[in-house]
Amino acid sequence: MKKSVRSPGSATVINAIATGFGAAFGIGLDIKCCANTQNSSITCSNDVGAPTTLMEICAKKTFEKYGISSDDFGMNFKTESELPMASGLSSSSALSNAVVSISSKIIAEEFNLMPLDDLEIINLAIDASLEAKVTITGSFDDATASYFGGVVVTDNKNRKFIIKEKMEEYPVLVYMPNFGSKSGSSDVGRMKVLSPLVETAFGLARSGDYFKALNLNGLIYANTLGFDSNIAIDALEVGAIASGLSGTGSSFVAICEDEAIDDIKETWSKYEGRVIETKVDNIGCQFIG
């Protein structure tokens, strides 16, 4: 049996590290995962030569959930990614969602078992990400924005939704500097110092004012983590609706109307790195074969 799944990344509205409450929205950059059955063992590979630890943990946890031994039944996983790694665009959440969802579907069909429901998949993927130490909070906001698409506002500590809804499919520009930033190794203490300010930004998100929330959150975290907040301000100056640091960096995102795309690209061209053009994703994780 062979199946393929598409799993998009997400961008930050509110980074949950400071307060435990977060918000994020799906973007049109994704990871594609293809899996096929084999006689035994779990084998994983990707197109970027990165460690496959997270993939292996996701598959192992799904096998354990169903009581399946990889000595008697196996799967081979391969991924191709449009998502830059260690950039604040939820590549780990997208990857874990993809592997858990595809392995669950194959096992359920192969053994005539019930497939995991959406939240079971998400929670298993989060548990795997925590075990792999690629997340600090569990990233329920990132994981659910990736899985469902649209925008989510969440209580990450308790893995609960506050808001889950579709978002207008604006163009999204991503500025990628020539370096990454792993969220699992971020300075948590430094970020928590600013929790009162982040709570103010979260209040905006909770009331549905996502763009102001993104702007404020981005400025707070960029300055706290040593990124150049002028990147976001420059985008706002030339017409972005909202712009800010995504996750713990290193990427910045700008949400805009079509007519502002070229101006934002131009103003960001003075910074070393590259600009990726995508849009808001409202589809989420879906099987494509």
UniProtKB/Swiss-Prot annotation:
InterPro entries: GHMP_kinase_C_dom (IPR013750), GHMP_kinase_C_sf (IPR036554), GHMP_kinase_N_dom (IPR006204), GHMP_knse_ATP-bd_CS (IPR006203), Ribosomal_Su5_D2-typ_SF (IPR020568), Ribsml_uS5_D2-typ_fold_subgr (IPR014721), SK_arc (IPR010189). Its main location: cytoplasm. Its EC number is 2.7.1.71. One of its GO terms (cellular component) is cytoplasm. PROSITE patterns: GHMP_KINASES_ATP. It is found in: Cytoplasm. GO terms for molecular function: ATP binding; shikimate kinase activity. Keywords: Amino-acid biosynthesis, Aromatic amino acid biosynthesis, ATP-binding, Cytoplasm, Kinase, Nucleotide-binding, Transferase. Pathway: Metabolic intermediate biosynthesis; chorismate biosynthesis; chorismate from D-erythrose 4-phosphate and phosphoenolpyruvate: step 5/7. ATP binds at residues 84-94. It is an enzyme of class 2 (transferase). It catalyses: shikimate + ATP = 3-phosphoshikimate + ADP + H(+). One of its GO terms (biological process) is chorismate biosynthetic process. Coiled coil: none annotated. Belongs to the GHMP kinase family. Archaeal shikimate kinase subfamily. NCBIfam families: Shik_kin_archae. This is Shikimate kinase. It comes from Methanobrevibacter smithii (strain ATCC 35061 / DSM 861 / OCM 144 / PS).
